[in-house]
Amino acid sequence: MNTNRWMQEVNARFPVRKSKVQKAQFRQYVLQKAQEMGYAARMEENKAICTNRNIVVGDVDKAKVLVTAHYDTPATVGLPNVMLPMNRPMFYLVQALIALVMVVLIFIPTGIVKKLTGSIFCTEATLIGLYCLMMYLLLAGVPNPHNVNDNTSGVCGVLALMESFAAEKPEKIAFVLFDNEEKGLLGASGLAKAHKQAAKETLVLNMDCIGVGEAMLMLVPKAAREKYPALGETARKSSGIPVVLGNMEKCNFSSDQKHFKLGVGICA
């Protein structure tokens, strides 16, 4: 499984996948690669707040395992995206500090406007306007140019697994690259609604930010732990790298697996 080769190619050709054009070009690339490997692949549209365009390789309804990742890349406002899935107190502390910075960035200009104008209308308009601007920048603002970890790494993990299974083309495995994870897990939400049985019964292995770290972290929900008790050991043997298991119920990992009952989050 040559993940590094995929990483070099995808990062060189499609480092940012945020605009409609960028995402369309990347979808065409993946569909072509899947077809070259001999897979049946398609773009599947769904509606969940907005139109989402997922890349589906194989049959979601017949598969016993879905291997997934999101292919869209985030915006940036200069604040770090800190992931501490196994350390809830530190995770909440970091999130609180980031929220504090955002509050300061909103309220200092608002205070200046209030002092200069003395107008309640101008003050409230500034407050609301800055808040809306901050939310826009977080969701649809300046594209982050550095996306190797989030989530070119996960995308390339899926592509590498597709390549490794290409000779067998097992019917029980399907691959999905989700759209609009960065806008609120929307692509995964739409797919789960369109494939309700799969959302309840199919094991989902979702790779998000797997590019940094010496070990694989698998966050497994209770339903998946009960149905697949040997999941961790199987992952260790097949991957050849250290695997750390965590209980999803005790961790923080907001990614596409949240829309699936047997959704396993995988990061590094």
Give residue ranges: language-model regions.
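N-terminal capping segment at the start of a domain
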Residues: 1-25, 31-33, 37, 139-145, ...
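Short secondary-structure junctions
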Residues: 38-45, 237-248
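Non-transmembrane, extramembrane segments of multi-pass ion/lipid transporters
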Residues: 70-84, 186
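Zn-dependent metallopeptidase/amidohydrolase metal-coordination segment
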Residues: 75, 247-268
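Acidic/histidine-rich catalytic neighborhood of metal-dependent amide-processing enzymes
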Residues: 108-229, 249-252, 256-258
